[in-house]
Amino acid sequence: MPAVTTPPSNSSTSPHKEAIRKLHDELAPERNRWLRKAAFFHSEDLLYLKFLIPAGSRILELGCGTGHLLAALKPSQGVGVDISSGMIEQARQTYPDLTFLQGDIEDPTFINSLSGPFDVILIMDTLGVLSDCQQTFTNLHQLCARETRLIVVYFSHLWKPILKLAELVRLRKPQPPQNVFSPQDVHDLVALADFEAVKAELRILSPLWLLGIGRFLNRFIAPAPGIRSLCLRHYTVCRSLLNKDDGIHSATVVVPARNERGNIEQAVLRIPQFCDDIEIIFVEGHSRDGTWEEIQRVMSVYPQRNIKAMRQPGKGKADAVFAAFDVAQGDVLMILDADLTMPPEHLPKFWEAIRSGKGEYINGSRLIYQMEDEAMQFLNLIANKLFSIIFTWLLSQRFTDTLCGTKVLRRSDYEKLKAGRKYFGDFDPFGDFDIIFGASKLGLKVVEIPIRYAKRTYGETQISRFRHGILLLRMVAFAFFRIKAL
């Protein structure tokens, strides 16, 4: 990792910091009472943070207060830091299994004393009192690995008058003078500190229960385009750009094949040697045209290629792909559909995008370049473009083509995706959305690579337009209730 310059800081002795420390020491005995007063708001906050942060993660919370949030996230290793000794004392008494440290998070010497890396670094309502946000972010790189997510949570500047009124009527605990940030300000600050915002979400339209109306508003009304910009809370998920390369060297290309006999040899001949160690796994799906026999023949003709073959245990593309992923040896996992409508010659672009750290989940897109005549029917094209807009909104990450078969991610990230699959369940027979939704939930950096979609030269398509459309409608409803409307 490149060296990070950390100039000395004397912010912990500034009058501003002393005022913050004193205020929070005074508020510490009453902290739990204030939490109970705003119990609904804090439960809404926690709901989304639990979605972002899997239980069992290694979590560092900067500005932890009395530790209630850190404990609720159920970390395997939890470290909380706060400038207030009063808050830290209460946290230690209440949650003895977690680690709580009193310190100034703007002090590079203190940050240097922490032992990382962590899976998640959480900065919750702390930006507003920092003297130098950019330098604070910069100091955190040494606590990050490639997979670490920095999550920054803050109040919308649009709500400042309402929050001030809540203080005056004693619905919110007293606050020190606050910096006020727009979403663009936060994105610029993390970028200046060599972090990259990979996902941004707005939530909570009502901080009050209102006899259940608040829950309805937050779940179903707050996500709506236009309304969303009025929400109280901003959540920005970032990754370190100084730790984006973790040394990948090998790849597995998984080729699910059902009734694709005429494409098997061409797949082997056309997959370039884009890295030193390429494993090709054909997964045969109960074909009727001799595909399995052709795979065996091709393996014997090209012994110099590392080709493996397996018959899928169940049915459907998802079953085939995940069966191969479970036995794959490569650092990077790639899906190449056996119809070769995504030209295998494009695979080096996908490899370079993930090897260089430009992306962590690489998705092909058929809908940017002109495609060959008859490669996709007009109604399919219109539907795909419409659904790409919907899924971009649902996932808060840009997608132009969710059903391109070529998808690439690290094997280590697939293992995390697999471990968290119980959240979504067995819902997708094709596997496209299983991977996309899992990557989005993990906060992976998504990069799309345009490909020139070619028409099929052998066999027939495995899916009808009607089934294709029904699948997309099902996935929209599923994503809304499992990702957007929590």
What are these regions (language model features)?
Residues T5-A55, L211, I221-A222:
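Conserved class I S-adenosyl-L-methionine
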Residues L101-G103, W292-V327:
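Conserved donor nucleotide-binding strand/loop of the catalytic core
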